[in-house]
């Protein structure tokens, strides 16, 4: 599969966004001293899901698939902000 400028640009944007989302959740887990092995905690499950999602090789995807991956990370960005902000309010 050929790598184009558009595809490389999309991958770079996804990498930046995914790192931001993952680091937000990781910082929350670490700052609140949550047990990273406790699968009963929503934040820990979210962290593990994001870790798995970050491991995919984006260069194997088509541009259309990358756009879907980008939307996934946008959704996870919004969701993680909602979940972590609710914890602060509660």
From Swiss-Prot:
GO terms classed as biological process: negative regulation of cell killing; response to toxic substance
Molecular function in Gene Ontology: toxic substance binding
Keywords assigned: Plasmid, Toxin-antitoxin system
InterPro entries linked to this entry: Antitoxin_epsilon/PezA_dom_sf, Epsilon_PezA_dom
Domain of life: Bacteria
Pfam families from the UniProt entry: Epsilon_antitox (PF08998)
Record family assignment: Belongs to the epsilon antitoxin family.
Function: Antitoxin component of a type II toxin-antitoxin (TA) system. Neutralizes the toxic effect of cognate zeta toxin. Part of a postsegregational killing (PSK) system involved in the killing of plasmid-free cells. Continuous synthesis of the epsilon antitoxin is required to counteract the zeta toxin.
Record's miscellaneous remark: Has a short half-life in vivo.
Record-given protein name: Antitoxin epsilon
């Amino acid at each position: 599969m050929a790598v184009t400028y558009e595809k490389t640009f999309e991958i770079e944007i996804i990498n930046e966004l995914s790192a931001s989302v993952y680091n937000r959740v990781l910082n929350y887990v670490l700052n609140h001293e949550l047990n990273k092995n406790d699968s009963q905690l929503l934040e820990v499950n979210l962290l593990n899901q994001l870790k798995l999602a970050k491991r995919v090789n984006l260069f194997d995807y088509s541009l259309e698939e990358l756009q879907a991956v980008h939307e996934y990370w946008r959704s996870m960005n919004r969701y993680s902000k909602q979940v972590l902000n609710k914890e602060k309010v509660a």
